[in-house]
Amino acid sequence: MIRKMKMLTEIDKVLPSELEKRSFEIITEELGDKKLVPGTELIVKRCIHTSADFDYAENLVFSEGAVEHAMDAIRRGTPIVTDTQMGKAGINKRKLAEFGSEVYCFMSDEDVAAAAKANGTTRAAASMDKAAALGRDVIFAVGNAPTALVRLYELIKEGKIRPELIIAVPVGFVNVVQSKELILSLKETPSIVARGRKGGSNIAACICNALLYQM
C-alpha cells in the first residue's frame, strides 16, 4: 500500500487541455541537441507523439521540398487516398474540408475486390489502380500494404500517374523495406518515407494531420 501511495504521488497532475502541450515539451527535451531538417520538425514530433518512438527522428526521410509541395497541393484541394479505413478515419476531415479536399479509401469497394481477384493481386494494389483512374492529382498515404507502394511505383514508371506526394510508412516484415526503397528511388516524386520496418496507418494519418495543422 505504501509503495502504491508513493507511485501515486509521483504521477504528474496535468490538466486535460495541457496534455498534448506537455507531451510535446517532453519530446523536445528528450530530442536534446538533435537537429531536424527545417520544415519537418512538426511532422517528426507528431510521429513520435503518436507512437512514443523516437526512432522516427532518424528514419523519416523527406524528399527535397516535399512538405511545401504537399501543403500547396492540399491548398489546391488535392484529395488524399489511403490504403486502410483506419488511416482514413484518423485524418482530420474538418481541417481537410477547409481546403475543399477529402479523403478516400477504396479497399472495401466491390469493384476493387473483383479486380484483385481477377488479376490475382491484393486489394491494396487494385485500390491504387482505382485511384489512378480518378484522373486527378492525388496524395497517397500508405501505412499498411507494401503491395500498394509496389503498384504505385509501377504506375508511375508506366506514366499512368504523377502523385503530388507519397507518404510511404507501411509497417511489417515482408517486402516492407524493399517497397519503401522503391519509392525513395523515384527522384521526381515527392515523398515522405519511414525507412525500415516501422510505420502504420496511425503514422500515415499522423503525417497528413501534421501537414494540415501547420497550414
Which residue ranges define each predicted feature?
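A short, well-structured juxtamembrane/interface segment
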Residues: 58-73
